[in-house]
Amino acid sequence: MTLWINGDWITGQGASRVKRNPVSGEVLWQGNDADAAQVEQACRAARAAFPRWARLSLAERQVVVERFAGLLESNKAELTAIIARETGKLRWEAATEVTAMINKIAISIKAYHVRTGEQRSEMPDGAASLRHRPHGVLAVFGPYNFPGHLPNGHIVPALLAGNTIIFKPSELTPWSGEAVMRLWQQAGLPPGVLNLVQGGRETGQALSALEDLDGLLFTGRANTGYQLHRQLSGQPEKILALEMGGNNPLIIDEVADIDAAVHLTIQSAFVTAGQRCTCARRLLLKSGAQGDAFLARLVAVSQRLTPGNWDDEPQPFIGGLISEQAAQQVVTAWQQLEAMGGRTLLAPRLLQLETSLLTPGIIEMTGVAGVPDEEVFGPLLRVWRYDSFEEAILMANNTRFGLSCGLVSPEREKFDQLLLEARAGIVNWNKPLTGAASTAPFGGIGASGNHRPSAWYAADYCAWPMASLESDSLTLPATLNPGLDFSDEVVR
């Protein structure tokens, strides 16, 4: 029984599903998808639970959420192993994900008060108040690259605001989704407040098509986000938050410490086997001898990166991709770029058949026309050379995406120029593209999102503002508007 609906674990009535470790092939999870009727059942449960949950005080809802944080802490080792084994991540990185989940609780509570709490301003004849109210029933679609942390970034603020939820994890990470749901169960969430439906495309389509849905919060690929946007078009009454991918540029300008710049680039491009939406996909490198030296050093260090299994000791820098198919897609993308005229500097290699262990790849595309503006979700870095900083900014903005952008340079003036001209929601200076502050919004523009950034700003899309003018008594104004006559004279 792998679905959690209205406080009960039940068996899915849809297609059967088996999840294997993408490196070892070990069977980790077996179950069945939710069919359309079970998705509707989950929605009815969430709708029935909404009035009571929304009427609880914030303090009462916060108690449950903080209890969940405590369970994350006490089950950290177990959840770390589940996420690592299911995604192919290494133990060290999965542990940082669980830590991020724990930290998200306090951050979300603070963000609720700062961004969507209550405010009151006294006026001569009363007061003006601002309150926030939950939307109702929200669907949360989780991604596979951070199956605990990223859905958590939607679920926690949505619950704090008083919403009820139907959560569909990625079909590639059902075990992680179930493990997190069982912790919420232990935390004492009332039945129907959070419901878990497992499944792939058919389950997702049934969920997004629900008429009695007040909104949808999505993290994933741009193509899926676009489909959801089209599906919900003409329904302005529903909140839609889309956090999608990017074709992110990293500009390497003048470099004082080549090894430091190489380290930053590897952290930007190859961490999590290149499976972060903010990863650098395009390296824009200044022409000249210094750029040549940097590129040679980047290739030399990157070719030492050997991916390994989640529990290998000593721990490698990168693990496997989410699946053998995902790894093969990266290899295919590299082959296509090479066929277009790209110059391979470091060829990506599958270490073993039927596994997702893939070494990083680097290919130079300078002067090649018609390179697709697409996100290759894996450890493949494309390189372009530029002559002037103005040209670098034009190249950086030459994408339909707009998630992250970075600059390596000692010159503050160039960063200030980039801040003015970059089209990206995250713009970093001498910091990895994959770094983000928990007290800042997380999201992009263009094909990277629909102006609903998450993280610190997630509270914004989990509640709607209600403005009030208030007075505890009603009296006739001392001064009336022209044309109003409240005298006792009888009009003849």
From Swiss-Prot:
At which positions is NAD(+) bound? Answer: G220, R221, A222, N223, T224, G225
Q: Which residues cross the membrane?
A: none
* GO molecular function, a single term: succinylglutamate-semialdehyde dehydrogenase activity
Give the enzyme's EC designation. Answer: 1.2.1.71
Q: Which pathway does it take part in?
A: Amino-acid degradation; L-arginine degradation via AST pathway; L-glutamate and succinate from L-arginine: step 4/5
- Annotated catalytic residues: E243, C277
Which InterPro entries does the UniProt record give? Answer: Ald_DH/histidinol_DH, Ald_DH_C, Ald_DH_CS_CYS, Ald_DH_CS_GLU, Ald_DH_N, Aldehyde_DH_dom, SuccinylGlu_semiald_DH_AstD
The Gene Ontology biological process terms listed for this entry are: arginine catabolic process to glutamate; arginine catabolic process to succinate
Against Pfam families, the record matches this protein to: Aldedh
NAD is among the record's keywords: yes
Catalytic activity as recorded in UniProt = N-succinyl-L-glutamate 5-semialdehyde + NAD(+) + H2O = N-succinyl-L-glutamate + NADH + 2 H(+)
Q: Which UniProt keywords apply?
A: Arginine metabolism, NAD, Oxidoreductase
Q: Does the keyword Oxidoreductase apply?
A: yes
- Entry's Gene3D superfamilies? Aldehyde Dehydrogenase, Chain A, domain 1 (3.40.605.10), Aldehyde Dehydrogenase, Chain A, domain 2 (3.40.309.10)
Q: What family does this belong to? A: Belongs to the aldehyde dehydrogenase family. AstD subfamily.
Q: Give a short account of what the protein does.
A: Catalyzes the NAD-dependent reduction of succinylglutamate semialdehyde into succinylglutamate.
Protein name from the UniProt record: N-succinylglutamate 5-semialdehyde dehydrogenase
Native source species: Shigella boydii serotype 4 (strain Sb227)
Record lineage: Bacteria, Pseudomonadati, Pseudomonadota, Gammaproteobacteria, Enterobacterales
